[in-house]
UniProtKB/Swiss-Prot annotation:
Function summary: Probable mitochondrial mRNA stabilization factor.
Taxonomic lineage: Eukaryota, Fungi, Dikarya, Ascomycota, Pezizomycotina
Membrane topology term: Peripheral membrane protein
Stretches for region Disordered: 36-76, 300-323
Organism of origin: Blastomyces gilchristii (strain SLH14081)
Range annotated as the organelle transit peptide: 1-52
Superkingdom classification of source: Eukaryota
Protein name: ATPase synthesis protein 25, mitochondrial
Major localization listed first in the record, in broad terms: mitochondrion
UniProt cross-references to Gene3D superfamilies, sorted A to Z: Beta Polymerase, domain 2
Family stated for the protein in its record: Belongs to the ATP25 family.
Segments of skewed composition (Low complexity): 308-319
GO biological process, one term: mitochondrial gene expression
Length: 724
């Protein structure tokens, strides 16, 4: 029965308890083994197998052995009595496993080690720490950063006491799922009402993806492709407005109320507003929203603390001029004036026949006297102004004279007020004029000097005077703003440096962008074609370029200047963003602005975008007249590298007569078309000599006939002079 009972119990603990119960009935007692009672010879136990077998043999034996008690030394009676006198200890209460409290894991999450959370700002709201941990650990967003915009004054459009969090999602699906879970978590945990702009719901995203797949399947069956630029799914950007939470306000309302002379409307914001910007990696790099707010915060902190604005890191090289400000006095300005650059009255860059060798000669060596020289060596110029000349007409007089004379009248530098008659009269009238008019006229004077590449007038000087004008709350008109922007974005490329200086310095562009920010706060329209075109041209190369990987060993390709591939791609990224702004804002360009855009695209070898813009002119309803076609062929005749698009260019020739009004070929058009033919088909002369019956040969003969005739064909107006 005992064996059957033991074999029927499978649990080892139960079997042990049953054995103990039977052993207690049989009279065998279990004595505790005292480690201190063993002798020195008994400290090492026998082998495990022998000990186990002998002990079990004695335990389950029915005949007690005589030496059964030898295994254990008897305890002294004194010790037994002491144990009996000692009160029994209360046994610890047994707690079942289902009632035991689980200890939280103290090990940190592996993502937290790889992606540390940004440090909390001063006086953070209580929700901020938990929100950051939820975004990083639970949602799995990367590259988390935090911007404290509570000190921004005036506050941003999103609200006062703003804290902005940025996070990068791994894809479009991860972006939508993370934003949806974040909103649900905020509603459930903190009872907030977040607003997510750009979020597609769970079912909405599935429906859109299903519809997109269905349209793609239908388009594939119809042997066509989907050409929709934006399907509304891949926005890559979701803005979650958490709302206003308690705590964390930067200024206390009672401190603001104690301000002396405080006048305003509205109420104080009790709490902090939190906004979470979730983007994909590509969208975050393209928008650079974090960098925009960071620069705005830095400029605002400097303004509020009364510190000077950030200037250009390098000494100002105005308009790309490589000359440094000189300390030459007007008495010795004759040599400096002789080397000034020739600039047209409207300050536009024009291409023409180079006469640099003649312009760079000294006045004495060339024998040309632009102005009489006094016996003491100074330039004797006619009086530019008189006592009766009004202040508003003084700066306009500088535009009506040659650049050499204008540079002389402007004196040594921006601090010069009396070295010339013009400056003496100008600042004398300036002291008697109203403050706003005086500030505007001084800005205009510095703008003219910068456009003339005067070495003593810098763009930082113009920015400083403009900031004083803004701080004084003087009015700014759109023409005045455009004049300031032209001066800040003016640049003269230097092809003699190593490497060539072909781009506007980043410091000059930063000054222009800061001016645009200030003007935008005054209500002036910035999303127009004029401002956009100036920024687009200012961020581009000013000469035809070609990208190369090895700039040191790059060969010369026609008239194109080699530039490094990294610089070329950086400029193209900026221009791509500006083109997206133009498309999103629906900016319409004028005819002259289209010409500037075409030139920049052609100089950058953006031939695909170039021809798309050419077609855009016709779609905009603008007539493509003779001047536009002359510009098109002249642009291709001056450069090369476009041979892959020669068929597209030659297809424009039959399109001329289909324009409204038609454009007929005359001598001017025939000359530039013939030059383009020679570049696109170098073997054209051999084919003409063989008199091949091809369209190219017929076009060449047509151009030859138009050139030989001294009058335009088919009644074209204004025939050009005969080509020798």
């Amino acid at each position: 029965m005992r064996r059957a009972l033991l074999t029927g119990i499978q649990c080892h603990a139960c079997r042990n308890n049953v054995v103990r119960s039977f052993v207690s009935v049989s009279g065998v007692t279990f004595m505790p083994l005292a480690s201190g009672s063993w002798s020195a010879s008994q400290t090492r136990p026998p082998p495990l197998s022998r000990n186990f077998s002998s002990q079990h043999a004695k335990l389950f034996s029915s005949h007690p052995s005589d030496n059964a008690e030898v295994a254990v030394d008897p305890m002294p009676e004194k010790d037994i009595t002491e144990e009996t006198v000692k009160p029994p200890e209360e046994p610890e209460e047994h707690i079942p496993w289902y009632l035991q409290e689980e200890l939280e894991a103290t090990t940190s999450h592996p993502l937290r080690k790889q992606q540390p959370l940004p440090p909390l700002p001063e006086n953070p709201p209580p929700i901020l720490n938990g929100l950051l941990e939820h975004i990083s650990i639970d949602l799995g967003l990367d590259d988390i950063s935090l911007l404290d915009l509570r000190k921004l004054d005036p506050p941003p459009a999103l609200g006062a006491n703003l804290i902005m969090i940025f996070g990068t999602a791994r894809g479009v699906k991860h972006l939508n799922v993370s934003a949806d879970r974040l909103c649900r978590w905020l509603r459930t945990t903190y009872k907030l009402r977040p607003d997510a702009d750009g979020l597609l719901g769970r079912n909405e995203l599935k429906i859109k993806l299903r519809r997109k797949a269905r349209r793609a399947k239908l388009a594939k069956s119809a042997k066509s492709t989907l050409t929709a630029p934006d399907d509304g799914i891949t926005t890559g950007w979701i803005c979650v407005d958490v709302g206003t939470v308690e705590g964390g306000q930067f200024r206390k309302p009672e401190e603001e109320a104690r301000k002396v002379g405080f006048v305003g409307f509205g109420t104080f914001v009790q709490g902090t507003r939190i906004v979470v910007q979730l983007m994909t990696e590509e969208k975050r790099e393209e928008v650079d929203l974090e960098g925009l707010w960071r620069r705005t915060l830095e400029r605002n902190s400097l303004e509020n603390e009364g510190l000077p604005q950030p200037q250009a890191e390098e000494p100002p090289q105005e308009a790309g001029d490589i000359h440094k400000p000189s300390s030459v006095t007007p008495a010795h300005i004759s040599h400096r004036v002789s080397h000034a650059a020739q600039i047209s009255v409207n300050y536009e860059q024009r291409r023409g026949i180079s006469t640099g060798s003649r312009q760079n000669r000294d006045l004495e060596e060339d024998g040309l006297n632009y102005a009489p020289i006094n016996p003491d060596g100074t330039i004797k110029l006619p009086e530019l102004i008189s006592e009766s000349t009004p202040l508003t007409s003084l700066t306009s007089r500088l535009r009506n004279i040659s650049p050499y004379e204008a540079i002389y009248h402007l004196g040594q530098d921006v601090n010069d007020t009396n070295s010339t008659t013009f400056l003496e009269q100008f600042y004398r009238k300036l002291s008697k004029a109203p403050d706003d008019l005086a500030s505007a006229q001084r800005i205009k004077l510095i703008c003219i000097a910068i456009m003339l590449h005067h070495p003593g007038y810098g763009k930082t000087d113009l920015f400083k005077v403009t900031q004083e004008h803004f701080i004084s709350n003087y009015g700014v008109t759109p023409p005045q703003f455009l004049e300031i922007l032209d001066a800040l974005l003016s640049f003269k490329p230097d092809l003699t440096s190593d490497p060539p200086n072909l781009l506007l310095p980043a410091a000059d562009m930063e000054l222009a962008l800061q001016t645009i920010d200030h003007v935008g706060l005054r209500g002036i329209d910035l999303l127009n074609s004029t401002v956009w075109m100036k920024l687009f041209v200012g961020a581009s190369f000013r000469v035809p370029v070609c990208p190369v990987r090895d700039l040191m060993n790059a060969p010369v390709i026609g008239n194109r200047t080699p530039v490094s591939l990294d610089t070329y791609e950086t400029v193209n990224r900026v221009q791509t963003r500006l083109l997206k702004v133009k498309t999103a804002a629906k900016i319409e360009l004028s005819a002259n602005e289209y010409l500037s855009l075409l030139r920049v695209l052609f100089d950058h070898e953006w031939y695909s975008m170039f021809w798309d813009t050419w077609e855009e002119i016709a779609l905009a309803g603008m007539p493509r007249d003779k001047s536009l076609y002359v510009f098109l062929f002249q642009l291709h005749a001056e450069s090369d590298g476009w041979e892959g698009w020669k068929s597209t260019l030659l297809n424009c020739i039959p399109m001329m007569e289909r324009e409204n009004p038609p454009v007929y070929m005359d001598r001017e058009l025939a000359e530039v078309i013939a030059r383009c033919l020679a570049i696109a088909h170098p073997e054209i002369m051999d084919r003409v000599e063989r008199n091949e019956p091809s369209p190219l040969v017929r076009l060449w003969h047509r151009c030859r006939i138009a050139v030989e005739k001294e009058v335009p064909l088919r009644g074209a107006q204004n025939p050009p002079s005969t080509m020798s």
